[in-house]
A protein has these predicted regions:
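Acidic, metal/cofactor-coordinating or nucleic-acid-engaging core segments within structured domains
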Residues: 21
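Phosphate-binding site of ATP-dependent enzymes
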Residues: 1-17
Length: 117
């Protein structure tokens, strides 16, 4: 995985695998990973936001998106996404700011049995 600036869609870190090996160059394309602009980023965000409206009971969902020549395509949605990969890529914890934001936006109480807010 690699860190992505959610506001711009620009990759902000080197790639990193689960063995903590880092990649400056993409292993398939050979392109330098940091600085890559993900294509049709705004369209991808809109696609995810619209799809999430069909699942309002889930405050947090993990979206796997493919960037194709025809635009972004949802591969799958995860009801209980693991934050490990995002923290692993950036080498910093993400939990507190995200959960503070979710609590404010959702105005709901966390239910550990359902893993939802």
């Amino acid at each position: 995985g690699a860190g992505v600036d959610i506001g711009t869609g620009v990759v902000t870190t080197v790639g990193r695998d689960y063995e903590d090996k880092t990649y400056i160059y993409h292993p398939t394309t050979g392109k330098i990973i940091p600085g890559i602009q993900l294509p049709c980023w705004e369209e991808a965000l809109l696609t995810v936001k619209e799809a999430h409206e069909f699942m309002p009971e889930s405050a947090v969902l993990g979206w796997d998106i493919a960037f194709t020549e025809k635009g972004p395509v949802i591969i799958e949605v995860n009801g209980a996404p693991g934050p490990k990969i995002h923290q692993f890529a950036d080498k910093e914890p993400k939990g507190k700011p995200i959960f503070d934001y979710i609590k404010v936006k959702s105005n709901r109480t966390y239910n550990p049995k359902q893993n939802t807010l």
